[in-house]
Amino acid sequence: MIKIAKEKRTFATKFKQMLMKETLKSYFGYDSFRPLQEEIIRHLLNKQDSLVLMPTGGGKSICYQLPALLSEGTAIVVSPLISLMKDQVETLQANGIAAGALNSSNDETENANLRRACIEGRLKLLYISPEKLIAEKDYLLRDMSISLFAIDEAHCISQWGHDFRPEYRRIRPIINEIGKAPLIALTATATPKVQHDIQKNLGMVDAQIFKSSFNRPNLYYEVRPKTANIDRDIIKFIRNNPEKSGIIYCLSRKKVEELAEILQANGINARAYHAGMDSATRTQNQDDFLMEKIDVIVATIAFGMGIDKPDVRYVIHYDIPKSLEGYYQETGRAGRDGGEGRCITFYTNKDLQKLEKFMQGKPVAEQEIGKQLLLETAAYAESSVCRRKTLLHYFGEEYLEDNCGNCDNCLNP
Protein backbone atom coordinates (compact mmCIF):
# COMPACT_ATOMS: atom_id res chain seq x y z
CA MET A 1 0.00 0.00 0.00
CA ILE A 2 2.82 2.39 0.95
CA LYS A 3 4.60 1.53 -2.29
CA ILE A 4 1.49 2.35 -4.39
CA ALA A 5 1.02 5.70 -2.59
CA LYS A 6 4.69 6.55 -3.20
CA GLU A 7 4.39 5.64 -6.89
CA LYS A 8 1.28 7.82 -7.18
CA ARG A 9 3.16 10.74 -5.64
CA THR A 10 6.12 10.23 -7.99
CA PHE A 11 3.77 10.13 -10.99
CA ALA A 12 1.96 13.29 -9.82
CA THR A 13 5.29 15.12 -9.38
CA LYS A 14 6.51 14.06 -12.84
CA PHE A 15 3.18 15.02 -14.41
CA LYS A 16 3.28 18.47 -12.76
CA GLN A 17 6.89 18.93 -13.95
CA MET A 18 5.90 17.97 -17.50
CA LEU A 19 2.94 20.36 -17.39
CA MET A 20 5.18 23.20 -16.17
CA LYS A 21 7.71 22.58 -18.98
CA GLU A 22 4.95 22.42 -21.62
CA THR A 23 3.37 25.67 -20.35
CA LEU A 24 6.79 27.36 -20.35
CA LYS A 25 7.36 26.37 -23.97
CA SER A 26 3.87 26.96 -25.40
CA TYR A 27 3.14 30.31 -23.70
CA PHE A 28 6.56 31.84 -23.08
CA GLY A 29 8.68 30.20 -25.79
CA TYR A 30 11.46 28.91 -23.49
CA ASP A 31 12.82 25.35 -23.53
CA SER A 32 14.10 25.39 -19.97
CA PHE A 33 13.78 27.27 -16.70
CA ARG A 34 16.35 29.74 -15.41
CA PRO A 35 17.97 29.14 -12.01
CA LEU A 36 15.42 29.03 -9.14
CA GLN A 37 12.35 29.55 -11.39
CA GLU A 38 11.15 25.93 -11.32
CA GLU A 39 11.62 25.67 -7.55
CA ILE A 40 9.69 28.91 -6.92
CA ILE A 41 6.83 27.87 -9.24
CA ARG A 42 6.53 24.47 -7.55
CA HIS A 43 6.49 26.15 -4.14
CA LEU A 44 3.68 28.50 -5.21
CA LEU A 45 1.64 25.69 -6.79
CA ASN A 46 1.87 23.94 -3.40
CA LYS A 47 0.09 27.02 -1.94
CA GLN A 48 3.14 28.23 0.00
CA ASP A 49 4.32 31.86 0.37
CA SER A 50 7.59 32.95 -1.28
CA LEU A 51 9.89 35.96 -1.16
CA VAL A 52 11.93 36.25 -4.36
CA LEU A 53 15.10 38.38 -4.49
CA MET A 54 16.37 38.25 -8.05
CA PRO A 55 18.30 40.86 -10.06
CA THR A 56 16.82 42.66 -13.07
CA GLY A 57 16.57 40.31 -16.03
CA GLY A 58 16.53 37.19 -13.83
CA GLY A 59 13.05 36.14 -14.99
CA LYS A 60 10.94 37.06 -11.94
CA SER A 61 7.63 37.55 -13.79
CA ILE A 62 7.39 33.94 -14.97
CA CYS A 63 7.59 32.85 -11.31
CA TYR A 64 3.97 33.99 -10.80
CA GLN A 65 2.66 34.12 -14.39
CA LEU A 66 3.17 30.41 -15.03
CA PRO A 67 1.55 29.22 -11.73
CA ALA A 68 -1.39 31.54 -12.54
CA LEU A 69 -1.96 29.60 -15.77
CA LEU A 70 -1.90 26.26 -13.94
CA SER A 71 -4.23 27.33 -11.11
CA GLU A 72 -8.00 27.79 -10.79
CA GLY A 73 -9.12 31.42 -10.58
CA THR A 74 -7.38 34.75 -11.26
CA ALA A 75 -3.95 35.87 -10.00
CA ILE A 76 -3.91 39.38 -8.50
CA VAL A 77 -0.66 41.16 -9.37
CA VAL A 78 0.00 44.36 -7.39
CA SER A 79 2.25 46.66 -9.41
CA PRO A 80 3.32 50.28 -8.71
CA LEU A 81 3.30 51.80 -12.21
CA ILE A 82 0.72 51.97 -14.99
CA SER A 83 3.47 51.74 -17.65
CA LEU A 84 4.77 48.59 -15.97
CA MET A 85 1.30 46.99 -15.99
CA LYS A 86 0.72 48.00 -19.62
CA ASP A 87 3.97 46.39 -20.82
CA GLN A 88 3.35 43.15 -18.92
CA VAL A 89 -0.29 42.84 -20.03
CA GLU A 90 0.55 43.52 -23.70
CA THR A 91 3.28 40.84 -23.62
CA LEU A 92 0.95 38.30 -21.97
CA GLN A 93 -1.88 39.02 -24.42
CA ALA A 94 0.52 38.66 -27.36
CA ASN A 95 1.34 35.19 -25.95
CA GLY A 96 -2.35 34.25 -25.90
CA ILE A 97 -2.82 34.70 -22.14
CA ALA A 98 -6.01 36.31 -20.76
CA ALA A 99 -4.64 39.26 -18.75
CA GLY A 100 -5.79 42.78 -17.95
CA ALA A 101 -4.89 45.84 -15.88
CA LEU A 102 -7.39 47.66 -13.70
CA ASN A 103 -6.17 51.25 -13.35
CA SER A 104 -7.04 54.93 -13.64
CA SER A 105 -5.87 55.20 -17.27
CA ASN A 106 -8.77 52.96 -18.43
CA ASP A 107 -12.21 54.41 -19.08
CA GLU A 108 -15.10 53.13 -16.94
CA THR A 109 -16.36 50.76 -19.68
CA GLU A 110 -12.95 49.05 -19.89
CA ASN A 111 -12.78 48.62 -16.11
CA ALA A 112 -16.39 47.33 -15.99
CA ASN A 113 -15.56 44.71 -18.67
CA LEU A 114 -12.46 43.66 -16.72
CA ARG A 115 -14.45 43.28 -13.50
CA ARG A 116 -17.01 41.10 -15.30
CA ALA A 117 -14.25 38.95 -16.84
CA CYS A 118 -12.75 38.40 -13.36
CA ILE A 119 -16.05 37.45 -11.74
CA GLU A 120 -16.84 35.07 -14.62
CA GLY A 121 -13.37 33.52 -14.30
CA ARG A 122 -12.24 34.47 -17.82
CA LEU A 123 -9.06 36.28 -16.74
CA LYS A 124 -5.92 34.48 -15.56
CA LEU A 125 -3.98 37.56 -14.38
CA LEU A 126 -5.27 40.91 -13.17
CA TYR A 127 -2.69 43.71 -12.68
CA ILE A 128 -3.73 46.35 -10.17
CA SER A 129 -2.11 49.28 -8.33
CA PRO A 130 -2.08 49.23 -4.50
CA GLU A 131 -4.49 52.23 -4.51
CA LYS A 132 -6.95 50.37 -6.77
CA LEU A 133 -6.60 47.24 -4.64
CA ILE A 134 -7.71 49.29 -1.62
CA ALA A 135 -10.67 50.72 -3.60
CA GLU A 136 -11.81 47.30 -4.87
CA LYS A 137 -11.43 45.29 -1.66
CA ASP A 138 -15.15 45.40 -0.71
CA TYR A 139 -16.46 44.81 -4.22
CA LEU A 140 -14.65 42.96 -6.98
CA LEU A 141 -12.14 41.06 -4.82
CA ARG A 142 -14.90 39.50 -2.71
CA ASP A 143 -16.83 38.25 -5.76
CA MET A 144 -14.01 36.56 -7.67
CA SER A 145 -11.95 33.40 -7.24
CA ILE A 146 -8.30 34.32 -6.52
CA SER A 147 -5.52 31.84 -7.33
CA LEU A 148 -2.60 33.81 -5.82
CA PHE A 149 -1.36 37.28 -4.88
CA ALA A 150 1.88 38.55 -6.46
CA ILE A 151 3.44 41.73 -5.05
CA ASP A 152 5.82 43.10 -7.67
CA GLU A 153 8.54 45.65 -6.78
CA ALA A 154 8.01 44.62 -3.13
CA HIS A 155 10.79 46.97 -1.92
CA CYS A 156 8.19 49.78 -2.27
CA ILE A 157 6.84 48.60 1.13
CA SER A 158 10.00 49.65 2.97
CA GLN A 159 10.98 53.16 4.07
CA TRP A 160 14.56 51.96 3.58
CA GLY A 161 13.77 51.09 -0.04
CA HIS A 162 14.40 53.62 -2.79
CA ASP A 163 10.76 53.76 -4.00
CA PHE A 164 8.76 53.86 -0.76
CA ARG A 165 4.97 53.76 -1.34
CA PRO A 166 2.91 53.93 1.90
CA GLU A 167 -0.07 52.23 0.16
CA TYR A 168 1.99 49.02 -0.01
CA ARG A 169 1.67 48.84 3.79
CA ARG A 170 -2.09 48.27 3.42
CA ILE A 171 -1.79 45.18 1.21
CA ARG A 172 -1.49 42.56 3.97
CA PRO A 173 -4.65 43.59 5.90
CA ILE A 174 -6.60 43.43 2.61
CA ILE A 175 -5.28 39.94 1.82
CA ASN A 176 -6.28 38.85 5.34
CA GLU A 177 -9.81 40.22 4.80
CA ILE A 178 -10.30 38.60 1.40
CA GLY A 179 -9.24 35.08 2.33
CA LYS A 180 -6.47 32.58 1.91
CA ALA A 181 -4.39 32.48 -1.27
CA PRO A 182 -0.63 31.96 -1.59
CA LEU A 183 1.47 35.13 -1.67
CA ILE A 184 4.64 35.79 -3.65
CA ALA A 185 6.61 39.03 -3.17
CA LEU A 186 9.31 39.92 -5.70
CA THR A 187 12.06 42.53 -5.91
CA ALA A 188 15.31 43.12 -7.78
CA THR A 189 16.81 45.25 -5.02
CA ALA A 190 16.64 44.42 -1.34
CA THR A 191 19.30 44.96 1.30
CA PRO A 192 18.96 42.77 4.44
CA LYS A 193 17.17 45.72 6.11
CA VAL A 194 14.62 46.05 3.27
CA GLN A 195 14.15 42.27 3.13
CA HIS A 196 13.25 42.26 6.84
CA ASP A 197 10.79 45.14 6.26
CA ILE A 198 9.09 43.28 3.38
CA GLN A 199 8.68 40.12 5.47
CA LYS A 200 7.36 42.03 8.49
CA ASN A 201 4.89 44.25 6.61
CA LEU A 202 3.57 41.50 4.34
CA GLY A 203 3.26 39.01 7.20
CA MET A 204 5.79 36.70 5.49
CA VAL A 205 8.15 35.96 8.37
CA ASP A 206 7.85 32.20 7.69
CA ALA A 207 7.90 32.47 3.89
CA GLN A 208 10.52 30.58 1.90
CA ILE A 209 13.20 32.99 0.64
CA PHE A 210 14.60 32.46 -2.84
CA LYS A 211 17.67 34.59 -3.48
CA SER A 212 19.87 34.47 -6.55
CA SER A 213 23.25 36.19 -6.77
CA PHE A 214 23.11 39.94 -7.33
CA ASN A 215 26.39 39.83 -9.24
CA ARG A 216 26.15 40.99 -12.86
CA PRO A 217 29.61 39.98 -14.19
CA ASN A 218 29.03 41.56 -17.62
CA LEU A 219 28.50 45.06 -16.19
CA TYR A 220 31.44 47.46 -16.02
CA TYR A 221 31.19 50.05 -13.21
CA GLU A 222 32.98 53.40 -13.32
CA VAL A 223 32.73 56.67 -11.38
CA ARG A 224 34.10 59.81 -13.06
CA PRO A 225 34.60 63.28 -11.56
CA LYS A 226 31.80 65.63 -12.62
CA THR A 227 33.31 68.79 -14.10
CA ALA A 228 32.06 71.78 -16.09
CA ASN A 229 32.79 69.68 -19.21
CA ILE A 230 30.30 66.91 -18.37
CA ASP A 231 28.10 67.52 -21.45
CA ARG A 232 31.18 67.33 -23.70
CA ASP A 233 32.31 64.13 -21.91
CA ILE A 234 28.91 62.48 -22.50
CA ILE A 235 28.80 63.52 -26.17
CA LYS A 236 32.30 62.09 -26.68
CA PHE A 237 31.32 58.81 -24.97
CA ILE A 238 28.18 58.41 -27.12
CA ARG A 239 30.10 59.18 -30.33
CA ASN A 240 32.64 56.51 -29.35
CA ASN A 241 29.73 54.05 -28.99
CA PRO A 242 27.72 54.71 -32.18
CA GLU A 243 24.32 53.07 -32.75
CA LYS A 244 24.32 51.56 -29.27
CA SER A 245 21.27 51.94 -27.03
CA GLY A 246 21.82 53.93 -23.85
CA ILE A 247 19.97 55.51 -20.94
CA ILE A 248 21.11 58.73 -19.22
CA TYR A 249 19.58 59.45 -15.81
CA CYS A 250 19.26 63.01 -14.45
CA LEU A 251 17.68 64.03 -11.15
CA SER A 252 15.59 66.96 -12.43
CA ARG A 253 13.09 67.17 -15.28
CA LYS A 254 14.66 70.50 -16.33
CA LYS A 255 18.09 68.86 -16.73
CA VAL A 256 16.53 65.95 -18.68
CA GLU A 257 15.06 68.35 -21.26
CA GLU A 258 18.21 70.52 -21.44
CA LEU A 259 20.52 67.54 -21.98
CA ALA A 260 18.23 65.90 -24.56
CA GLU A 261 18.28 69.19 -26.53
CA ILE A 262 22.09 69.49 -26.28
CA LEU A 263 22.53 65.91 -27.54
CA GLN A 264 20.10 66.50 -30.43
CA ALA A 265 21.94 69.72 -31.36
CA ASN A 266 25.12 67.61 -31.56
CA GLY A 267 23.58 65.13 -34.00
CA ILE A 268 22.74 62.45 -31.43
CA ASN A 269 19.40 60.67 -31.79
CA ALA A 270 18.13 61.31 -28.24
CA ARG A 271 14.77 61.99 -26.59
CA ALA A 272 13.58 63.05 -23.15
CA TYR A 273 11.37 61.11 -20.71
CA HIS A 274 9.93 62.28 -17.39
CA ALA A 275 6.64 62.18 -15.48
CA GLY A 276 5.86 65.85 -16.22
CA MET A 277 5.56 65.27 -19.99
CA ASP A 278 2.17 64.59 -21.52
CA SER A 279 1.45 60.89 -21.53
CA ALA A 280 1.25 60.53 -25.36
CA THR A 281 4.74 62.04 -25.92
CA ARG A 282 6.21 60.03 -23.06
CA THR A 283 4.77 56.76 -24.40
CA GLN A 284 5.91 57.61 -27.94
CA ASN A 285 9.49 58.29 -26.79
CA GLN A 286 9.57 55.07 -24.76
CA ASP A 287 8.21 53.01 -27.68
CA ASP A 288 10.67 54.61 -30.14
CA PHE A 289 13.53 53.66 -27.81
CA LEU A 290 12.28 50.07 -27.49
CA MET A 291 11.80 49.82 -31.27
CA GLU A 292 15.36 51.15 -31.97
CA LYS A 293 14.10 54.32 -33.66
CA ILE A 294 16.22 56.35 -31.24
CA ASP A 295 19.56 55.49 -29.61
CA VAL A 296 19.48 57.43 -26.35
CA ILE A 297 16.79 58.18 -23.79
CA VAL A 298 17.51 60.97 -21.26
CA ALA A 299 15.27 60.38 -18.27
CA THR A 300 14.42 60.80 -14.63
CA ILE A 301 14.12 57.61 -12.59
CA ALA A 302 10.45 57.48 -13.73
CA PHE A 303 11.87 55.60 -16.73
CA GLY A 304 12.92 52.00 -16.62
CA MET A 305 10.97 50.04 -14.01
CA GLY A 306 9.79 46.97 -15.88
CA ILE A 307 11.16 48.17 -19.25
CA ASP A 308 12.17 45.07 -21.15
CA LYS A 309 15.00 46.05 -23.50
CA PRO A 310 17.76 43.45 -23.30
CA ASP A 311 20.38 45.26 -25.42
CA VAL A 312 20.90 48.54 -23.52
CA ARG A 313 24.68 48.94 -23.80
CA TYR A 314 25.30 51.77 -21.32
CA VAL A 315 23.65 53.57 -18.43
CA ILE A 316 25.02 57.00 -17.48
CA HIS A 317 24.16 58.80 -14.24
CA TYR A 318 24.48 62.55 -14.81
CA ASP A 319 23.89 63.05 -11.07
CA ILE A 320 24.72 60.78 -8.15
CA PRO A 321 21.69 58.55 -7.33
CA LYS A 322 19.85 58.99 -4.01
CA SER A 323 20.63 55.44 -2.87
CA LEU A 324 22.81 52.46 -3.76
CA GLU A 325 19.66 50.40 -4.31
CA GLY A 326 18.44 52.90 -6.89
CA TYR A 327 21.90 52.89 -8.49
CA TYR A 328 21.95 49.08 -8.66
CA GLN A 329 18.47 48.91 -10.17
CA GLU A 330 19.14 51.63 -12.75
CA THR A 331 22.56 50.28 -13.82
CA GLY A 332 20.91 46.85 -13.96
CA ARG A 333 19.02 47.95 -17.06
CA ALA A 334 22.25 47.60 -19.06
CA GLY A 335 23.34 44.32 -20.63
CA ARG A 336 20.31 42.24 -19.69
CA ASP A 337 21.08 39.95 -22.63
CA GLY A 338 24.44 39.07 -21.05
CA GLY A 339 26.32 41.30 -23.51
CA GLU A 340 28.34 44.45 -22.84
CA GLY A 341 26.96 46.89 -20.28
CA ARG A 342 28.88 50.03 -19.27
CA CYS A 343 27.68 51.88 -16.15
CA ILE A 344 29.20 55.34 -15.78
CA THR A 345 28.39 57.74 -12.96
CA PHE A 346 29.51 61.36 -12.73
CA TYR A 347 30.15 62.47 -9.16
CA THR A 348 30.80 65.72 -7.36
CA ASN A 349 30.34 66.60 -3.71
CA LYS A 350 28.10 69.50 -4.77
CA ASP A 351 25.43 67.00 -5.84
CA LEU A 352 25.21 65.72 -2.26
CA GLN A 353 24.53 69.23 -0.97
CA LYS A 354 21.85 69.67 -3.65
CA LEU A 355 20.16 66.38 -2.70
CA GLU A 356 20.27 67.24 1.01
CA LYS A 357 18.50 70.52 0.20
CA PHE A 358 15.74 68.57 -1.61
CA MET A 359 15.08 66.70 1.64
CA GLN A 360 14.37 69.81 3.69
CA GLY A 361 10.72 70.11 4.64
CA LYS A 362 10.21 66.34 4.71
CA PRO A 363 9.41 64.55 8.01
CA VAL A 364 12.50 64.21 10.25
CA ALA A 365 12.52 60.38 10.11
CA GLU A 366 12.40 60.50 6.31
CA GLN A 367 15.25 63.04 6.22
CA GLU A 368 17.40 60.83 8.46
CA ILE A 369 16.85 57.76 6.27
CA GLY A 370 17.48 59.84 3.12
CA LYS A 371 20.76 61.19 4.51
CA GLN A 372 22.00 57.74 5.49
CA LEU A 373 21.20 56.30 2.03
CA LEU A 374 22.98 59.27 0.45
CA LEU A 375 26.09 58.82 2.60
CA GLU A 376 26.31 55.17 1.53
CA THR A 377 26.18 56.23 -2.14
CA ALA A 378 28.85 58.89 -1.57
CA ALA A 379 31.10 56.35 0.19
CA TYR A 380 30.74 54.04 -2.84
CA ALA A 381 31.62 56.86 -5.26
CA GLU A 382 34.69 57.95 -3.26
CA SER A 383 35.98 54.44 -2.49
CA SER A 384 39.05 52.88 -4.12
CA VAL A 385 37.79 49.33 -3.34
CA CYS A 386 36.36 47.07 -6.09
CA ARG A 387 32.93 48.50 -7.03
CA ARG A 388 31.43 45.03 -7.43
CA LYS A 389 32.63 43.92 -3.98
CA THR A 390 31.13 47.07 -2.37
CA LEU A 391 27.79 46.70 -4.16
CA LEU A 392 27.38 43.01 -3.36
CA HIS A 393 28.37 43.57 0.27
CA TYR A 394 25.61 46.19 0.47
CA PHE A 395 23.10 43.51 -0.56
CA GLY A 396 24.42 41.09 2.04
CA GLU A 397 26.40 39.00 -0.47
CA GLU A 398 30.07 38.10 -0.13
CA TYR A 399 32.34 38.54 -3.16
CA LEU A 400 35.58 36.64 -2.63
CA GLU A 401 37.63 37.86 -5.61
CA ASP A 402 40.18 40.60 -4.90
CA ASN A 403 39.97 41.93 -8.45
CA CYS A 404 36.76 41.72 -10.52
CA GLY A 405 38.57 42.87 -13.69
CA ASN A 406 35.50 44.88 -14.73
CA CYS A 407 35.38 48.15 -12.79
CA ASP A 408 37.51 51.30 -12.80
CA ASN A 409 39.08 50.59 -9.40
CA CYS A 410 40.21 47.09 -10.37
CA LEU A 411 41.43 48.02 -13.84
CA ASN A 412 43.24 51.18 -12.65
CA PRO A 413 44.21 50.56 -9.01
Regions found by a protein language model. Name each.
Residues 15-27, 31-35, 39-61, 69-71, ...:
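Helicase motor core with emphasis on the C-terminal RecA-like subdomain
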Residues 7-8, 154, 281, 387:
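Short, intrinsically disordered low-complexity segments
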Residues 355, 359-413:
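C-terminal accessory/connector segments of nucleic-acid motor ATPases
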Residues 1-6, 10, 14-16:
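Short, positively charged and aromatic/hydrophobic N-terminal segments
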